């Protein structure tokens, strides 16, 4: 499908929250006043210089920004092609990019007078970031997490509990991220007066996809400045993994109107695109889920299918609506990596660079192993290393033991 190209790829969404045919706000009547209040509060925060000053202070002194742009010399030499840089989001406080967005949303929640924060989490990184900021600001925190993810991400469950959050295992459906999001939305509907729903990815009803993207765009903004300092020019290509896609949009968005920059998103191909996977663009079609229209994994009857990935953060059966639009306009190329490819990349990076990545960005690294050797040595490639792999070590160790 082709979409008429806009004057700018950075101008969306429109006033109703649409990116082309994608996005919007498909929510229960009970929630609509809340969504409109949030939109108004966020617009007010954006227009308030003191809000940005306060946020910048926390990003610097609490989160630890700017995160480094690191030249991966040994990986570059090993692949023999493009010069590879990592945007080191795994060095942020809490261990991933998630904290950038959570800080912004919690500051908006405080502005709205909300005292109770709910969140969904898959890999647990968003849950940890939310629990962390709630502890910092003295707010009640409830995190919904699929029971399957609770089992495979125990280190993060313990972290959330130590930070004072209540972790609610979700037993419905496939007991993963989609089901956790369903439960969070149900809670929100019944607790509208005092509760703020802190969504972890660039999905959900408007203004969430825009708001999450805006808070994450610091990744790409810093990368532009850092690459100019390191190489005197823009990168030639960007690569990031995609679940809902907030880490990718954070890196991509500031570069969307730079036509010389190639952009690649990497979905989770699971066991392969003809089997169990979570690649919504490669194997899905447009539909409505969790308040927005986007590409979804659906059966012939339009029922949502379960996503599968070795990575708990990528098995969502949809993708952020802006990604769907960027796919249809052709501005971003979407690829996919299997569980086995991600696992191999996880091990390779650990041994070559002394950096243990999360399984989520290991999917992006897996595609870099193919893309980089095809490009000349003066090609500058930036990968968003969106999280660290501490949370995945027990799971990976168990898989590797089983392979012996």
UniProtKB/Swiss-Prot annotation:
The keyword Lyase applies. GO terms for molecular function: tryptophan synthase activity. The keyword Lyase applies. It catalyses: (1S,2R)-1-C-(indol-3-yl)glycerol 3-phosphate + L-serine = D-glyceraldehyde 3-phosphate + L-tryptophan + H2O. Pathway: Amino-acid biosynthesis; L-tryptophan biosynthesis; L-tryptophan from chorismate: step 5/5. Tetramer of two alpha and two beta chains. This is Tryptophan synthase beta chain. It comes from Rhodopseudomonas palustris (strain BisB18).
């Amino acid at each position: 499908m082709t979409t008429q190209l806009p004057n700018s790829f950075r101008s969306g969404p429109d006033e109703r929250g649409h990116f082309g045919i994608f996005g919007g706000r498909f929510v229960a009547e009970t929630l609509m006043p809340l969504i409109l209040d949030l939109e108004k509060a966020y617009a007010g925060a954006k227009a308030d210089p003191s809000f940005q000053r306060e946020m910048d202070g926390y990003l610097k002194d609490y989160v630890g920004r700017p995160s480094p742009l690191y030249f991966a010399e040994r990986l570059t030499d090993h692949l023999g092609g493009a010069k590879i840089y990592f945007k080191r989001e795994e060095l942020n406080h809490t261990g991933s990019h998630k904290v950038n967005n959570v800080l912004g949303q919690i500051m908006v929640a405080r502005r709205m007078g909300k005292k109770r924060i709910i969140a969904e989490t898959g890999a647990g990184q968003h849950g940890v970031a939310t629990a962390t900021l709630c502890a910092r600001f003295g707010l009640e925190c409830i995190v919904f997490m699929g029971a399957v993810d609770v089992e495979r991400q125990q280190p993060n469950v313990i972290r959330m509990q130590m930070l004072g959050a209540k972790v609610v295992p979700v037993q419905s459906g496939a007991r993963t991220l989609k089901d956790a999001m369903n439960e969070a939305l149900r809670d929100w509907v019944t607790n509208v007066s005092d509760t703020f729903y802190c969504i972890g990815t660039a999905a959900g009803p408007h203004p969430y996809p825009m708001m999450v993207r805006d808070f994450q765009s610091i990744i790409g903004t810093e990368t532009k400045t850092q690459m100019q300092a390191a190489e005197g020019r823009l990168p030639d290509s960007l690569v990031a993994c995609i679940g809902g896609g907030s880490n990718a949009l954070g890196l991509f968005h500031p570069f969307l109107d730079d036509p010389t920059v190639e952009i690649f998103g990497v979905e989770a191909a699971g066991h392969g695109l003809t089997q169990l996977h979570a690649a919504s663009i490669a194997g899905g079609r447009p539909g409505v889920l969790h308040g927005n229209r986007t590409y979804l994994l659906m059966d012939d009857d339009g029922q949502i299918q379960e996503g599968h990935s070795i990575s708990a953060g990528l098995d969502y059966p949809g993708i952020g609506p802006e990604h769907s639009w960027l796919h249809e306009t052709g501005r971003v190329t979407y690829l996919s990596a299997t569980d086995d490819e991600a696992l191999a990349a996880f091990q390779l990076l650990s041994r070559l660079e002394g950096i243990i990545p999360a399984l989520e960005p290991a999917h992006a690294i897996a595609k870099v192993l193919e893309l980089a050797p095809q490009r000349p040595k003066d090609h500058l490639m930036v990968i968003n290393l969106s999280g660290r792999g501490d949370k995945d070590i027990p799971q990976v160790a168990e898989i590797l033991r089983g392979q012996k």
